[in-house]
Amino acid sequence: LSYTYRHSDRLFNGQSGVANPNNISTTFHRISLNGQFRFSDELTLSAFVPWLEGGRKERGTTDRRLSGLGDVTLLAQWSPWAGDAEAQPLLSGLSLLGGIELPTGEDNDQPFTGNAAPSLFQLGNGTFNPKLGFSYGKAIDKSSYFGRVVATIPIGESDADLDSGSYLQASVGTGYRLTDALTLQLSVDGTFRERDQLNNVDVSNTGSVSLSVTPAVSWRVNDKLAVDASASIPFFHDVRSTQVAPGTSFQLGARFNF
């Protein structure tokens, strides 16, 4: 179970911040119920069910709201060498990822294309979105190292003729176990988005590159419960046209083992 908060109020054009005289901003709250089942050392299946609350403001007045179920994601992780770590010490940390994002979130009949992040302000994009990628993790004594790359490739168009752009998410980081219960992590994360299309025409204020640094802490309360906290702090934006760039996001989570 996790909760994420993000407030965004900085306008960018390309890599430069620009004036925001109308005080355009967006605020998002997301509660996500996540489940994971391990069939074996090699195969794990995960599900992510998000609930979203959001609003867009201009000149101090909320002109757009979101509330409801977002797009549910199913993801399989296959680690072919996980059960043979002694014979394959380097490959044992490699996992292949594959899954799909389901169109469970409501998509708008007339998607909003104003200066907002995301540019098309809706709970879901109305298409099936396959996901492919890989991850790698390695622990050495009290230190750990990890990386992850996942591409999302929407198929087809929504009922409103919205063709969402593909995007790539990448992360690389390290962790250090201070005690048996307390671990600190630091990662650099990137999101690379192609432009969306509406009625077969590029939406000008879509498509971007965002980089952020994410410090995180994990506390294992006992064998059944762990608590996590993190903050994702953007340090680089490169957007097409003028957009509200994503602001800092804060996340709190709890993990239960059954």
Where are these regions (language model features)?
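Surface-exposed strand-loop-strand hairpins of Gram-negative outer-membrane beta-barrel proteins
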Residues: Y5-R30, T113
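Outer membrane beta-barrel transmembrane domains
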Residues: R10-P21, D161-F258
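Residue-level signature of outer-membrane beta-barrel architecture
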Residues: Y3, F37, V49, W78-P80, ...
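Residues that define the transmembrane beta-barrel architecture of outer-membrane proteins
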Residues: T27-I31, L66-V72, S92, G126-P130, ...
